[in-house]
Amino acid sequence: MTVGVFAALGEEVARVRECLGGVGTERAGLTFYVVSVGALQVVYVCGGVGKVNAALCTQLLISEFGARVLINTGIAGALDERLCVFDVLVSVDAVQHDVDVTAFGYQKGRIPRMDSVEWTANTALRYLVREAFDLCTRDPEWTEGACALSGSGDPPSRVSRLVEGRVASGDLFVSDAQTRARIIREFGAHGVEMEGAAFAHVASVNGVPFVIIRCISDGAGAEQDVSMSYKEFSTRAARRSALLTLRVLERLSALRTSVVASLFPMVVV
């Protein structure tokens, strides 16, 4: 079985490359790294920021490399008050907060001719992420540099938290309270970033199970200076997301073929 891993930024995939290596293959000006992890073939790519780049990479992972399970790893801004810097958001579903065709009677976020606003993540993959997270929290590399979101009142040593919820994506970096409040009000999202929903859209229309893993890097406009928070925490948050992704790959590689077939019935193994 081939698992595709997409990240937007170099720091979001750096730890994966350190651990897995792989042979680079060029497609559309991007380098896709192919490597065996147990019985799995893993293909991972740093594809660039934004929804178009996410869609491009996701389709290439499916069409060119035969990915039958997809993981999007990276960082996000927190919209849920339970989430602090270095906590983890795992997608229940994903929406595009910058799509607006309401002038023609469509619900905010809904693309014409699509059945719904949201793209739903695979339940079995979410379970594997939760299992992997439990393992990560016992890893010294994971706990190094733990810190709560500035102003939250939580001590720097607080235990990392995993929250499952809605990921909202759009082609803008959310850094002001007004935009933040709008996304929460209109979509009930738990975190915001710039790629996940496009990744989820392409995975879904191809019938490929997916999950989005996001480590929180900032408060998406909740703090006084979001750019300062992002610059300070993004690299470490990205590393955590990559560590969690590696653990998920380990869990997937340990599954028997019969188990994979039962968990992902549409997957050819």
Curated annotation (Swiss-Prot):
Its EC number is 3.2.2.9. GO terms for molecular function: adenosylhomocysteine nucleosidase activity; methylthioadenosine nucleosidase activity. It holds the Pfam family PNP_UDP_1. Signal peptide: none annotated. It catalyses: S-adenosyl-L-homocysteine + H2O = S-(5-deoxy-D-ribos-5-yl)-L-homocysteine + adenine; S-methyl-5'-thioadenosine + H2O = 5-(methylsulfanyl)-D-ribose + adenine; 5'-deoxyadenosine + H2O = 5-deoxy-D-ribose + adenine. Belongs to the PNP/UDP phosphorylase family. MtnN subfamily. GO terms for biological process: L-methionine salvage from methylthioadenosine; L-methionine salvage from S-adenosylmethionine; nucleoside catabolic process. It comes from the Bacteria. Pathway: Amino-acid biosynthesis; L-methionine biosynthesis via salvage pathway; S-methyl-5-thio-alpha-D-ribose 1-phosphate from S-methyl-5'-thioadenosine (hydrolase route): step 1/2. Catalyzes the irreversible cleavage of the glycosidic bond in both 5'-methylthioadenosine (MTA) and S-adenosylhomocysteine (SAH/AdoHcy) to adenine and the corresponding thioribose, 5'-methylthioribose and S-ribosylhomocysteine, respectively. Also cleaves 5'-deoxyadenosine, a toxic by-product of radical S-adenosylmethionine (SAM) enzymes, into 5-deoxyribose and adenine. One of its GO terms (cellular component) is cytosol. Keywords: Amino-acid biosynthesis, Hydrolase, Methionine biosynthesis. InterPro entries: MTA_SAH_Nsdase (IPR010049), Nucleoside_phosphorylase_d (IPR000845), Nucleoside_phosphorylase_sf (IPR035994). Substrate binds at residues 77, 174, 194-195. CDD domains: MTAN. This is 5'-methylthioadenosine/S-adenosylhomocysteine nucleosidase. The gene is mtnN. It comes from Treponema pallidum (strain Nichols). The keyword Amino-acid biosynthesis applies.
